[in-house]
Amino acid sequence: MWGIGWKIGGEYMLLIGNGRLITRDAQNHFFENGCVAIDGQVVKQVGTTEELKQAYPEATFIDAKGGVIMPGFINMHNHIYSTFARGLSLTNYHPKNFMDILVDQWWRIDRALTLEDTYQSGKVAYLDSIRNGVTTVFDHHASYGEITGSLTQLSNAADELGIRTCLCYEVSDRDGEQKMREAVQENAAFIKASSLRNDDMQKAMMGMHAAFTLSDASLELCAANTPDGIGYHIHIAEDLADVHDSLKKYGKPIVNRLFDLGILGKQTMAGHCIHIGPHEMELLRDTGTMVVTNPESNMGNAVGCPPAMRMFNEYGILMGLGTDGYTNDVTESYKVGNVIHKHHLADPNAAWAEIPTMLFDNNPQMANRYFKTKLGVLEPNAAADVIIVDYHGPTPMTKENYTMHILFGMNGGMVTDTVINGEIRMRNREVQGIDEEKVWHDAQTQAQSFWKRVNQ
C-alpha cells in the first residue's frame, strides 16, 4: 500500500478526506467535508474530516482537495477480449446486421486470440478500469484460438493490478463440439480455482454465449459442470436472430427454453434481454434472474433498445448496468442509459430514477450475490473500494441531487485516486505497484502482432 499509516487491529489505517463524501448507505449519508477511515480491507468509519482526523491522528491521510469521495464503480458486463479491436481495421469486413458483426468481427477476433493476447488485454483493460474508477469487473471472455488457461491469464492480470473481478468463459457450439467441451472445462477449472481463494477478490460463473449457439445437450453439459451456488452468465435476445432461432428450432421463446433447462435463477446473469415478451419477463422475475443492460453497445450494434423501464418498474426485475466491452468507463453507460430510454419511449420523464438505481444500488446488490464483502457502499465493514473524483461543479451538490452531478458533470477521466480492498491502486492519477508505461507499451506491441494474425 502507498504510504505507511497508523497500525490498528492488525492493519494500517488510511484516511481519505477533505471532500464531499457520497456513502450510498441506507440513510444516504452525505458529508460536505467528509472522510472515510479504512482499516485493512474494509471501511472502519465514515464522518467528517475533522472528527476522523482527531480519532486517528497517526493514520495516513489522502487529501481529496475538495473533490468527491465515493464508492468505486462496478461494471456488471464486460468483454476484455475485445480490447485489441480498438482501432483495428479488418479486411473484408462490411457488416449489414448484428450477425455479420458477430461472425465477421468478434468470432474472427476471438479465434485469433492467444493466451498472451488474453493476458496483455487483461492487464491493459484492468488498468484502464482502475483509471476510470472501476473497482469490480464482471467479465465474459472468449478466445477460441486458445481456450485452456485463458481465465487464468485474466486472473493473473487482475491480481497484478489488484482489481476485483468475476470471470467466465463463453461456451458455444460455433467452433465444434471439441472446443465447446474445452470451454466448459475451462469454466469448471476456474470455478474450482476461485473457490479455493479466501481473499474475496476473484469469483467465477459458468459462461455461455447465447441460446442460438448452444444446443440443449451443450446447455445440459454446462449445467452438469456447474456447482451449487454458481450461476450462468449468458446473452439473451440481444438480436432478433436469437429469438427466431429459438422459435424455429425449439418452438418456444429463449427465456422459456432456458427456464426448462434450469439455467435461470438468482445466481444467473442475463445480458441485454432486448427482444423478450411479458411472459419471459415473468420468468426472469419469478426465478430472481439478474438482467444487465448495456445501452451504449446496443446502440452501436443497432440491435434495439431493451424494455428496461418495463422490466424494472412493472416486473421488478433486478437490473444492472454494464459496458459490454464498449468502454471501461461505466459513467458512459449511465449517460447513454439516461437518454436512450427517453428517446425510445418519447418520454422525457423516463429513466431519471431507474438508471442511477441500476448503477448505484443494483450493481452492488448483484455483485454481492458472488462477493461476500459488501460492495458499492461506504459504511463500517463494507469493502474499502473508494475513489476520488476531481469534480467541483458550478452548482451546489447535496444528498438529493448528487446523481445529477455525476450524470451531467463527471466522467471516468476525472478520477484521481482509486483504492481497492484497502490498497491504493491509483494515487494522483498514477497507477501504483506497476510500470504503467510498460503495460501500455506491451499491449500495443502485442496488439500489432494480433492485428497481423487476425487479418491473415
Show which residues each predicted segment covers.
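A conserved active-site cap/scaffold subdomain adjacent to cofactor or substrate pockets
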Residues: 286-317
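Divalent metal-coordination and catalytic microenvironments
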Residues: 19, 36, 41, 66, ...
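Active-site microenvironment of metallo-dependent hydrolases
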Residues: 5-34, 39-44, 49, 55, ...
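Metal-coordinating catalytic core of metallo-dependent amide/deamination hydrolases
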Residues: 141-273
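His/Asp/Glu-enriched, well-ordered alpha-helical/loop segment
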Residues: 261-263, 267, 307-393, 409-411
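Alpha-helical scaffold segments that flank or form the walls of functional sites
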Residues: 88-140, 145-163, 185-197, 444-446, ...
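Active-site gating loops and adjacent loop-to-helix segments of metal-dependent hydrolytic enzymes
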Residues: 84-118, 175-176, 240-267, 287-290, ...
